[in-house]
């Protein structure tokens, strides 16, 4: 035999071989259409018997294999069906002639033959020929199946006659010797009458009859004949035929034990996997459909069975274990003859199929190992491919996947052997793909991210390189790029540094002609190659969605607690948020992005390559919201370690946006990398809410930017910092420019301020503004600007605490000789005399010490769709103010004035600047102070009524202890006094001015002296008030009326009081004359009595006196000392001094 039939299985021994061939020129499509129709008739019940006749069809069969038909009858071509195309009667003779010629090739073994003509429209001239049938077309041939069944019936008749002829031979007749072609020369010269020769003839004929019985469906008879043949042939040591008899016995037993067959689907797969060269593959490929029989349909051997026959069958039939032993024995006998190599190989294949059914893989592997070592004649390349492919399929059948992959790879390499003129790269590529499972290699990159690596990486890399090379030789660059990308992605950890460089360079070379994409590649065989994202080029270790910058972060307007709950709801509001695991799964984070704003995602990436990795583009993959990403390009150093990369984009719609991954372009390969497929990835959440668009506000000021960064204790962040230098008490006007740089109108603006990080005590409002002029320009359209005027007013403590005198003495500076009308009494004193500071005592005594004030101006604004949804933004402006000292009040005291309702405030003012400075109070002349000079300033002021401040009802609600309440009262008193004084300073050379506040300067004693007494006393002479050095004129001898009024401004009732009027004369030399009984006389008593006076009530008492001589007289009104009035302070009983001038009536007439 020339070519082994690797598709053989044990049940083929019961089949009749029919060859179907084309005659003349006929299209393969038409031929195989009819071939499939014919081969579908594979089992027939002949002559209405219970036997089952099985047919095996081939469209190609070597003639030399037919010569082995006597050795095993299933190898004999007993039927021939020819298919021809004949459209006219003129071509019919020529077609029939060719049909006859093709019959000659198998004439020695043919039982019958048929010729099917297609396209013949007329009537055949010779109607007597039953072996020729014509049909109008290939589609209109419904009777083909019936004619094939009739043809099989005729084969059965011949077969049955031959069987009967062989079994009915008489014992005396000479039995012919059956032999195989290579045995002809071996029997020359042998004695045909010898007993040995006769036994050989008998044994071979018994074996031959067994084959015929098996083909005829008589299994029991076949078993009997096989057993007899084995005994006869064993006796004469006819090893090859003994092996055939044993194999026949095994086949009959397999048919009995395994009615489903041993070939089955595996046989189909084997036929389909036969790989040939490019042209021969196309020509012979349809032969894979030569699956002929379904041995499972065999249920009887055609003989009427009874219990005895069942017992006999069980006795003659081999057990499953005996079947394997007999196969081994048969194969060992085959091995004794080199010419029986093909028979030996096919027997091994059949045994393997049986062992596969029995699930005895190790035993099957021994048979397959024998197949490998069977030495056949010089095989063609096509036959080598077929042999290795079948070995691979058989190893796969028994579960030896890696061994199967090995032989399949050998077959693939054989397809492109150097000896082949036209290498079959497509067949090679197909076979290489089929080897992947055997080497634990999948073309899905997801399988390599699940746990540890499986398989031998070195072998897998070699196989992937071969796939790349085969793809390139096939002329499919996209396929080569896909496999090379897969190699680089999945085998990166096993590549050396040089291999990494080489693979990357090759990939860049391939992608320059055909870029790598994320589209799946569908192969002609139907296999789909999934995309290969480069999740390792670079490796991403963490993904973090970043919040917007501080100036752009949206905030939600806070509603009232439970405001959104329905009033009809039965549920009680609770601030406790229920734990929801679905939120963890969604990974939603607690800040928002804004529609239309640039949003950022930070990736920590790592370059595992030993060279600089260039990422041409890198962007985000999102879902849920329309997102416009802004591609980034980066270059990572070799083995860079973790490297931060920020990817940005702009959400164009609102809703929930989920960052699913990122896409890259590396080495010409475009990759979509999903976060779910990244092992060991850390992220802070992938889903964020995108709220409606908001305007963007940009502010700029006339002040320079500050190098000081404000860090409020509250944690607020300040976006812009400016600084300014001011003198204490100075006010700075700042113009803030508000520009809408967004795409939405600015509709709402709120401005607030607060002071931070300062230990200095300041007075008044640090920052003030009027928002109405700015709001009048709203809504502010995109690109428009508005202005806001803000006043920075620094008013720190102007006192020098180290030298603030606690006594109210005049310090030796007399002012009694100055005119009362002058508001300023000043004496220039050296700085040493005033002793403002002992510079060696404290560092804080340095008058030039610069203090710092810091404040934040917060702009809360909104507009557009975001405003409708209740969102706003905050923009903060940080102010750093360096406050230089201007003036200090080193000493403060008071002097009584001529009026009981006035007093003099005395200030020692020190100029701590390096410039000449002027200072003045309201509507008064200026006092000039040189640098470092200290002067005293006296200001006459009306006393203050602090009762309204002291009784403020809301104070106790804002303070926690009495000390705080008292401090606030004192501050309020100082504020009122400061507003009345209006002291201001000015530096003419710098054109700068400011306020000098006395709020922190006045101590409690000074405040008491400035406070208007609760009991207000008024003295009137002849109805005219006597106060402020006023002189009342009267005539000698004329009585004058004296009226004393008391107004009770205290909270309690006072009185009764007794007041005594004592007149005296002042000689202006310190001597007072009280002995005036002969000069002044009273009309009535000189004592006035005032009863109890209720709060806010008034009491008046009247008297009169008479002056008998001219002169200047003074009236001293004193209270009688009694116990009832000692509880009231003496300051409450300050009555004005009364100055009366008595003139002579004659002198007045003369004037």
Curated annotation (Swiss-Prot):
Keywords: Cytoplasm, Differentiation, Endoplasmic reticulum, Golgi apparatus. Its main location: Golgi. The keyword Endoplasmic reticulum applies. GO terms for cellular component: endoplasmic reticulum; trans-Golgi network. One of its GO terms (biological process) is cell differentiation. It holds the Pfam family TRAPPC9-Trs120. It is found in: Golgi apparatus, cis-Golgi network; Endoplasmic reticulum; Cytoplasm. It comes from the Eukaryota. Part of the multisubunit TRAPP (transport protein particle) complex. PANTHER family: TRAFFICKING PROTEIN PARTICLE COMPLEX SUBUNIT 9 (PTHR21512:SF5). Functions as an activator of NF-kappa-B through increased phosphorylation of the IKK complex. May function in neuronal cells differentiation. May play a role in vesicular transport from endoplasmic reticulum to Golgi. Belongs to the NIBP family. This is Trafficking protein particle complex subunit 9. It comes from Xenopus laevis (African clawed frog).
